[in-house]
Amino acid sequence: MNIGFKEDLTIEFKSDKNKLPDSDLVDAVVAFANTNGGDIYLGIEDDGEITGLHKSHQDITQLAAFIANKTVPPIAVRAEKSEDKQYLKISVPKSRSIVASSSGKIQRRRIKADGTPENVPMYPHEIASRLSDLSLLDYSSLCVPDAKYSDLDPVERERLRSIIRMNPQGEQN
């Protein structure tokens, strides 16, 4: 039996025939939370074939609690079994901060050249960009080491002064 749709940036299938390792599930949740959120279908192969849940993943309350305990900050997922109880849909919200696994692993999702999704590490240089996307970091407010007054464009300084003067709510100094 096939689920009838494919994986994309917000949908991931995870096989659970031989019990998906807990770390793989947590990494997938972290990647979704650090991208746009989405749904993880546990008990479904990459080709969409429904192969069923392992007995250790039958308790959805326990699974949701486990995920919250293994993510930093804790991610509250919503887990629901299919009507035939053969697979689990785990809905992961988009996080308003950067999320890591409790072991310190930070992941994100992306689309490969062939159009299929994958989870990849989020490297330190990508963290500032992600924080900016979340409106948590303003690059213009960062200090520039060794900058001097003479580095600033005098025309732009005068343009800024003019804008400030025209704003009746702004300071006049």
Residue ranges and their predicted role:
Residues M1-N173:
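Conserved N-terminal catalytic/coupling substructures associated with nucleotide/phosphate chemistry
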